[in-house]
Amino acid sequence: MSRRGTTEEKTAKSDPIYRNRLVNMLVNRILKHGKKSLAYQIIYRAVKKIQQKTETNPLSVLRQAIRGVTPDIAVKARRVGGSTHQVPIEIGSTQGKALAIRWLLWASRKRPGRNMAFKLSSELLDAAKGSGDAIRKKEETHRMAEANRAFAHFR
């Protein structure tokens, strides 16, 4: 038995302007090469574009988009005997949000277009409406989990 104590889970900090943890999680995932100020710029421009397009609270659109993309279940590769099975596992809320943010950024980077702020705002609006590549990725993951339900007992 380990003598080392358990560590407390870190709480996500909130961003300086909106005081929102989701925005901060998004900033930390979009971050490249340590340029956090550029990441903040991209996010804030995307939020401003959402505000201009919808004329509603952009944070509610962001929450709705992330809620729509968050998966309930995913598959994990598990080696049993000599073969590898895709085992469906339930996902917690924090891990689900992290996956949703990762998929939203992946989908927005994949989009053709001018700059990242424009692409991210478009993807967030699509996800809030229930369409877009990030939503498709979630549905594909759910389909994979449903197809491999027979291996659920390998958890």
UniProtKB/Swiss-Prot annotation:
Its main location: plastid. Keywords: Chloroplast, Plastid, Ribonucleoprotein, Ribosomal protein, RNA-binding, rRNA-binding. One of its GO terms (cellular component) is small ribosomal subunit. Disulfide bonds: none annotated. The keyword 4Fe-4S does not apply. It is found in: Plastid, Chloroplast. GO terms for biological process: translation. GO terms for molecular function: rRNA binding; structural constituent of ribosome. Part of the 30S ribosomal subunit. One of the primary rRNA binding proteins, it binds directly to 16S rRNA where it nucleates assembly of the head domain of the 30S subunit. Belongs to the universal ribosomal protein uS7 family. This is Small ribosomal subunit protein uS7c. It comes from Houttuynia cordata. The gene is rps7.
